[in-house]
């Protein structure tokens, strides 16, 4: 009986310790939980703008801000979150968003990740006109040709950066990463250690083996977090996400785009400015 009582007491102790540890773990997790805003409130947009203006040209940030405001107003804040909250992958009412946009903007399809990233960085990074194949940028070209977002010379630099480049026929992402490093090194992306262009690079072999920046955004350092700025697609909203570390942002992006591959191509990979980012997730 005494042994049973001792055993019972130990079990209670173990369970209570487990609950306590779980509680501590939950508290620690909550401290680093990512939060997201669509910048549809004045407060959140001001917060993001102030962060960006620490590192980027004021006129570029102002132009970006006007694009955010125009998009959010056009879709009447449908499905948008003003304040930062833990839901970083929300569901959007795309049918309503598309109807509102088309009814007010007509044939202008709006802007995407590449256009908004370039707007923010265009007067901070370098410029180099190199031969390009912008076949995969048909929608980007339509958006830029039907707006005054970029000047003719800025368009040329945009196409030079984001058009697809040739690579080798291999599934080795490191080979492709080196090719992309060589390409992006032309544009002086490392102009400030506290802000960077982060890209998701896709390997395609439909016409020939090539690399294409399928998604891109800007990552800025704050005192206790990193702020990630992205426009998901032409139709989808802007998102500003706070991550505890750079690695959290990189993993979020890889997890989102990891299936953009085929049996004959490499998995997507992440670039920070002109450097390949190594992730354990590549091995899975």
Language-model segments: residues:
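N-terminal mature-domain "stem" immediately C-terminal to a signal peptide or N-terminal signal-anchor/transmembrane
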Residues: 24-74
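Positively charged n-region of N-terminal signal peptides that target proteins for export
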Residues: 1-4
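C-terminal motif of bacterial Sec signal peptides marking the signal peptidase cleavage site
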Residues: 13-16
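Outer-membrane beta-barrel translocator/channel fold
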Residues: 238-243
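Bacterial signal peptide processing site
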Residues: 18-20
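Low-complexity, Gly/Ser/Thr/Pro-rich intrinsically disordered linker/tail segments
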Residues: 228-231, 244-284
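Acidic/His-rich structured neighborhood in mature extracellular/periplasmic domains
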Residues: 57-204, 208-213, 221-236, 249
């Amino acid at each position: 009986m005494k042994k049973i009582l001792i055993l019972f007491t130990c079990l209670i102790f173990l369970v209570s310790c487990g609950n306590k540890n779980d509680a501590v773990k939950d508290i620690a997790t909550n401290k680093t939980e990512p939060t997201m805003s669509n910048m549809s409130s004045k407060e959140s947009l001001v917060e993001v703008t102030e962060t960006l203006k620490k590192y980027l040209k004021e006129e570029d940030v102002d132009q970006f801000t006007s694009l955010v405001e125009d998009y959010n107003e056009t879709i009447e804040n449908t499905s948008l979150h003003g304040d930062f909250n833990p839901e970083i992958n929300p569901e959007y009412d795309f049918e309503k968003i598309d109807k509102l946009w088309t009814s007010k903007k007509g044939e202008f399809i709006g802007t995407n990740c590449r256009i908004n990233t370039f707007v923010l960085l265009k007067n901070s990074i370098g410029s180099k006109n190199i031969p390009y194949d912008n076949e995969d940028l048909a929608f980007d070209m339509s958006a830029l040709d039907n707006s005054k977002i970029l000047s003719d010379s800025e368009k040329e630099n945009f196409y030079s950066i984001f058009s697809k480049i040739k690579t080798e026929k291999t599934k080795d992402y490191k080979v492709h990463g080196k090719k992309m490093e060589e390409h992006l090194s032309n544009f002086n992306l490392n102009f400030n250690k506290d802000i960077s262009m982060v890209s998701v690079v896709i390997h395609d072999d439909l016409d020939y083996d090539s690399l294409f920046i399928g998604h891109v955004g800007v990552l800025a350092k704050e005192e206790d977090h990193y702020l990630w700025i992205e426009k998901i697609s032409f139709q989808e909203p802007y998102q500003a996400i706070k991550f505890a570390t750079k690695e959290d942002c990189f993993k979020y992006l890889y997890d989102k785009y990891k299936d953009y591959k085929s049996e004959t191509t490499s998995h997507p990979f992440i670039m920070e400015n002109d450097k390949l980012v190594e992730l354990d997730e590549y091995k899975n």
